[in-house]
Amino acid sequence: MAESLAHIKYVERMAKYAETIPQNFVPSVMSADLPSYGQRTPKVINGYYPDLYYYDLHCVIIGEAKTTYDIENEHTQAQLDSYIREIRTYNCDKHIIICSSIIAFAQITNMVIRKKQRELIRDITFHVLDNHLRHKVI
C-alpha cells in the first residue's frame, strides 16, 4: 500500500489522469496502489511494483508517484529504466506517468526531457503531473 498521505494523493491524481489517455478506457484493467483497489499493482517489473498499471490491446500505462525527496536518485533512475525496458515490449501506445508535488514539477519535467534526449526515447509518451492540475506531456 501507499506509504504516505502525499503518496496516496499522487496515485489518486495519476489514476484520474490515466482515464483520459486511452481512447476507450476500460476501468477493470487498471490497478493502482490505493486503498480503494485493495492491493498493490500485481505487475512486477524487474522487482519494482509500479504505483499504477493499465493495459489493454491499444495502450499500456505505467505510473509512478514520487515524493519531493525521492526524485533524482539511483533508485528512481533504476525504476524508470526498468519501466522503459518493460513498456517497450508492448506493441501499442506506450505511456509513463510520473506524479509529484508542485515543488518538484519542474525538476521531474527537466529530468524526463534530459532522459528522452540522452537516450533517444521517441516511442514512449511521458506525462509529468503535479498534485494540483498542472501536467506536461513530453
Where are these regions (language model features)?
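Charged, structured surface patches that assemble and position nucleic-acid processing machinery
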Residues: 112-138
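Well-ordered, non-membrane alpha-helical segments in soluble/globular domains
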Residues: 9-12, 74-83, 107-113
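Active-site metal-binding core of divalent-cation-utilizing nuclease and nuclease-like domains
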Residues: 2-3, 24-58
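Nucleic-acid nuclease catalytic cores
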Residues: 84-118
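Conserved catalytic cores of phosphodiester-cleaving nucleases, focusing on short active-site segments
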Residues: 52-72, 83
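Structural motif
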Residues: 31, 66-67, 98-102
